[in-house]
Swiss-Prot record:
Name by which UniProt lists this protein: Peptidyl-tRNA hydrolase
Role of this protein: Hydrolyzes ribosome-free peptidyl-tRNAs (with 1 or more amino acids incorporated), which drop off the ribosome during protein synthesis, or as a result of ribosome stalling.
One annotated GO molecular function: tRNA binding
Signal sequence residues: none
């Protein structure tokens, strides 16, 4: 078993303009988790983000939706980590993933940023790549010149349904992730998608 999770970061952009876009699936995932735990987000100006707290086995787990816009997410994440003395290995970042098809979710530790500006910002501000990522597939437009426009638009109805279903499944795996049983979480999460 790894270290239990103490911080879950959902990546996205603030404001109605970006709500329901592919780039905001990290926010959507975190909203679903907060709703299931019956907690609400409040603005914490010192962290430049919307925060909530849940408890699991007498451990505080902080939920964070940075309000800095994607490219500066690391500033918000680093502030929370410093304040609560959370090391990167105790953090899960939930984000959109172009390299996975809609409906596919993968859990992994460390690795590169895959060109994701939110991840780049977090890596730069924490000086570490060693944190857990829950990668939610949104598909790829097929042309890298169309990526920015693609992620800043909502998924098509059938893609949204697949993403929703995958998020629902990942919520069933959440307790394993939270307590640091990542091997079991990956097995359950990834096996379902191979059938």
């Amino acid at each position: 078993m790894e270290l239990p999770v103490r911080l879950v970061v959902g990546l996205g952009n603030p404001g109605e303009k970006y709500a329901s876009t592919r780039h905001n699936v990290g926010f959507d995932w975190l909203d679903r988790l907060a709703s299931s735990q019956r907690v609400a987000f409040t603005l914490e100006t010192r962290f430049r983000g919307l925060c909530a707290r849940i408890m699991l086995a007498d451990t505080d787990i902080w939920l964070l939706k940075p309000q800095t816009y994607m490219n500066a997410s690391g500033m918000s994440v680093a502030a929370v980590c410093r304040y609560y003395k959370i090391v990167p290995e105790q953090m899960l970042v939930v984000h959109d993933e172009l390299d996975l098809q809609p409906g596919v979710i993968k859990l992994k530790s460390g690795g590169g940023t895959g060109g994701h500006n939110g991840l780049k910002s977090i890596v730069a501000d924490l000086s570490s790549q060693v944190f857990w990522r829950l990668r939610i597939g949104v598909g790829h437009p097929g042309d890298r010149n169309q990526v920015v426009d693609y992620v800043l638009h909502p998924p098509r109805r059938e893609e949204a349904a697949l993403i929703d279903e995958a998020i629902d499944h990942s919520m069933q795996v959440w307790p394993l992730i939270a307590r640091g049983d990542f091997a079991a979480a990956m097995q359950r999460l990834h096996t379902r998608q191979e059938n």
